[in-house]
Amino acid sequence: MTPWSSRQAPIAAPLPDTPSPIRLGLGANSRQFTLLVVVNAFVGAMVGLERTVVPLVAQADFGLVSKTIVLSFLVSFGIVKALANLFAGQLADRIGRKPLLVAGWLAGLPVPLLIIWAPSWGWIVFANVLLGVNQGLCWSTTVIMKIDLVGPARRGLAMGMNEFAGYVAVSLSALLTGYLAAAHGLRPAPFYPGIAFAVLGLVVSVFAVRETRGHARAESRQLGADAPRLGFGGVFLLTSWRDRALFAASQAGLVNNLNDGMVWGLIPVFLAARGVTLDRIGVVTATYPLVWGMGQLATGALSDRWGRKWMIASGM
């Protein structure tokens, strides 16, 4: 396999707002890339906190029996995360990537505390609104920043490593909360790790992660991308309707996340109703994101060689 360093793009011309020439490529930016992988692992761990326990908290602590009400936390999370994803890209180009990443972590800080202290189900729903902001801003921003760093040649690998870190962390966090819940109850013990995840994610993002918008500008200059850019509405129409390939990719993502939501919201309740212990529920809920994450290492790298279309079709 060709070493990462041999795949680096040429040094870009210095930009007015950067102190030194910018290099694109995984080898040239390995330290920052690794930090972003770690940050996204914390992002995944935050959402993994809820995979095993929160649907059960609805019934055990608040006496909710309606599946519609139980799933309201997931609906609030999904809507807010979708909106955060929608605007994250445009805002990242306007104000920079790092400010969005930090803002996402600030939104995530109260989440475990709200769940721990919640006197009513409404607190859980509000915690998931904040978690949706956290996930939408932080996950999207880490994706954008990794793509900025590696340049055009290895974007599949960059995405694969991002998703690997995120979903393996989801899995391990779900497994951990299952064991903590079995040993110490549904609250508060399973959510204590979330405080550490949020604080560490914020600290690394503030003090170690660097802005990558200059890398995107450098790549644009190298490629001579002087054509006028589409506005927000034009990009939205292109990706969601006008371009058939992008439309197909968008609907595939929709279906994929609908499946994920079903697994997250219903499987813990289904298993608990049949007498499955909390630690075993944790194993089941951890298996799905673990396989998802491990597969990303292969599919991300292979998509750079073989293309994306048939991998998406095979997965569907």
Indicate residue ranges for each PLM-predicted region.
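C-terminal ends and interior cores of transmembrane alpha-helices
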Residues: L106-P119
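Helix-to-loop junctions at the C-terminal end of transmembrane segments
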Residues: A84-G96, A181, G295-G307
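Residue-level signature of mid-helix packing/kink "hotspots" within the transmembrane helices
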Residues: G78-L86, S171, P289-L297
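Cytoplasmic helix-loop-helix junction between adjacent transmembrane helices
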Residues: A127-Y167
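Symmetry-related core transmembrane helices of the 12-TM Major Facilitator Superfamily/SLC fold
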Residues: A189-V206
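Juxtamembrane intracellular "pre-TM" segments in multi-pass secondary transporters
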Residues: R7-S30, E211-A248
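Helix-loop boundary and gating motifs at the non-cytosolic
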Residues: G27-G78, F247-A248, A252, N256-R274
